[in-house]
Amino acid sequence: PYECPGEPFGGTEQLAWSPDSKKVAYTCRKKVGREYAVSTDSDIYLYDTESGNTTNLCKPDGYKAPAIDYTKTLATQQVNHQDGDMSVGYDINPQFSPDGKHVAWLSMKQDGYESDRNRLCVYSFADGKKNYVTDSFDSAVETFCWTRDSHNIYFIGVWHACLNIYRTDLTGKVEKATDEIADYGSLQMLGNTGNLIATRHSMSAPDDIYLVAPQKKGKLAVSTRLTKEND
């Protein structure tokens, strides 16, 4: 009775194949009726194509959600004040690291709060632990992609009304890759070149495709416009 992608806005970004093609990570909100209508608690599930087993990567085995009083706001209820990290908000858009050792996704902290901050969560298959690598970034993550060596993640984040590109390693050290009065989007790695492809627009220019060449740590990336479709 459940769907993936999630309605009404979800797309193919809400599921991902593992590099070895043996597993599928997918986004799903496994609730029905009133719970489905009120809750924003979607999780990332891992389906093993060989065994047929499904594992919830967001919650511990046997987890049972606290009872909810639907006549009151969820903000003050137990579901949002549990011991430990129960991932009760939106968890969406999984991406496996190229080496298959991690899977990352966007995660909101609170249930019932659709405007919560999107954090970037990285799950390690080695120890089953989650690490929110953008906790030090005081804003939301829009989209992201892994580097080919699986050591870093590039993401687009909003700061001072601009969408720029940032980089984080797996320990949560965040660095700015671009610093422009513009909005980047649709971020992807360009093969094994180490470069990125992204869209970019500003108050003076519509969307075009840009090549973004990251530099050594501590230096900003060099962006080169590739298309002029809207000139």
Question: What label would you give each PLM region?
Answer:
Residues 1, 13-19, 23-28, 175-231:
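Non-catalytic accessory segments flanking enzyme active sites
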Residues 1-11, 27-43, 56-92, 104-121, ...:
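A flexible loop/linker signature enriched in serine peptidases of the S9 family
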Residues 16, 47, 56, 95:
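Ligand-binding pocket scaffold of soluble enzyme catalytic domains
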Residues 18, 97, 147-149, 190:
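Structural WD40 beta-propeller signal
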Residues 22, 43, 101, 151-152, ...:
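Generic structural signal for coil-to-beta-strand starts
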Residues 48-52, 124-128, 168-173, 214-217:
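Short loop/turn segments that connect beta-strands within beta-propeller blades
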